[in-house]
């Protein structure tokens, strides 16, 4: 309420935060992504809580993404000091990367539960048109190996995916504890939907949520429009 909190609420991230709130309130994903994204009572509570937070935040939240949140917090500005949940970038917790070194930790709790965040990240993929398949496979295995993940990969500014690297004392010493101090969040996070057609929902769902989150108008209609988009993305009727 002091105005020191900043969050990323550009359209895509409001949708992913909605997934997070639904998974947290529902206590898991078993009831999610059926005929609707979530049962009505879960979805309503999720959006109401998102709006409650955003009404306490600077309107700049609706224009920024997670990297911009990190840029703001690690800069010389004096207004914002904390973000309760955001995709993590370990670079900002390393010395010398930005004006100020950030400190990352596990996400906040909602009631008795830690928020069940939506897992992000990127990976390596091999094209079906690859002309040097074995060499490419060998490189992927090399890059993803335990030793490389906690040494060369991290040294080059990479964010390792190998769990052992997240627990490695040297890696954590050089990243202000980023990996060890956020590991619980990662371990209980939920995967975003992966069905064929999902990107249609991801690309447009946040825009559907945006007006309600900014104005508080027509919660019921907002959820109806979001679920219509969801059903269309899944090829469901109605």
Each language-model region and where it sits:
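Paired acidic/hydrophobic, glycine-rich loop segments that form the ligand-binding mouth/hinge
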Residues: 79-86, 103
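Beta->alpha turn/N-cap motifs
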Residues: 66, 83-91, 122
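Short helices/loops that flank or line small-molecule/ion binding pockets
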Residues: 1, 54, 66-82, 207, ...
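Extracytoplasmic/periplasmic solute-binding protein
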Residues: 1-36, 77-80
